[in-house]
A protein has these predicted regions:
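Generic secondary-structure boundary signal with a strong preference for alpha-helix termini
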Residues: 16-18, 82, 177-178
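Short beta-strand motif preference
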Residues: 83-85, 162
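C-terminal cap/loop subdomain of S1 sulfatases and analogous C-terminal strand-loop tails that border
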Residues: 49-76, 91-100, 104-191
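Short secondary-structure boundary/capping segments
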Residues: 12-27, 126
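Metal-dependent active-site segment of extracytoplasmic phospho-/sulfohydrolases and closely related
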Residues: 1-13, 40-44, 60, 77, ...
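Surface-exposed acidic, glycine/proline-enriched linker/cap segments
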Residues: 24-65
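Short hydrophobic/aromatic-rich motifs at helix boundaries and adjacent loops
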Residues: 35-36, 79-81
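Short connector loops/turns at beta-strand edges and beta->alpha or beta->beta junctions
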Residues: 86-90
Length: 191
């Protein structure tokens, strides 16, 4: 699996301290430059002294050709990532990408299928929930194999999406990752 999910847009306009961006603390380019110079110049960026976060526009670019970014359960920019499977003794070399929809929760059922393992119903006296995923072994030998995953639900911080038989429906939640989520003090209710 090439990445955890889409590129991250929480950096808003960019920051030398990711927690500033995540907590909606605005900073300026001049402040970024001053901090970088104080910590060793441009060579400090990306090193152990900084926890920098790129501009949200770079996240959109990084998720191309899909729209949106990490923390948005919509339109693949925040949810779709490539996976490469290699098993020279079982899978014949084939340069054709597979476009069948799969999800990370399909990996274990696929491994169980390959190893002919039936998932246990009870482990150490504890009843086990059934696995959510399905095996995608059929795609190993046939680039045009029919999809086996029919439905997958996505939800992150109120942003929701559902994939069903080739269709995707989605909606934004209460927070947009590239906008500072700082409520007005009158909106705070400590009780």
């Amino acid at each position: 699996i090439v990445s955890d999910n889409g590129a991250s847009a929480e950096g808003m306009e960019g920051s030398v301290a990711e927690l500033n961006a995540q907590n909606g603390i605005p900073t300026t380019v001049a402040e970024h430059i001053a901090v970088a110079e104080q910590l060793g110049g441009l060579d400090a960026i990306g090193g152990p002294k900084m926890d920098n976060m790129y501009h949200s526009a770079w996240a959109w670019a990084g998720d191309s050709p899909f729209r949106y970014t990490k923390l948005v359960a919509a339109d693949w920019g925040g949810t779709r990532t490539p996976m490469v499977i290699s098993w020279p003794n079982r899978i014949k070399p084939d340069k054709t990408p597979r476009s069948q929809f799969t999800h990370v929760n399909d990996v274990v059922p696929t491994i169980y299928d390959l190893l002919d393992i039936t998932p246990p119903k009870v482990v150490d006296g504890h009843k086990q929930d059934p696995l959510d995923g399905v095996s995608f072994v059929s795609t190993f030998d046939a680039a045009d194999a029919p999809e086996v995953k029919e439905t997958q639900y996505f939800d992150i911080m109120g942003s929701r999406g559902i994939y069903h038989k080739g269709w995707m429906a989605s909606t934004f939640g209460p927070r947009t990752p590239w906008v500072a989520a700082v409520p007005d003090l009158s909106d705070w209710d400590p009780m």
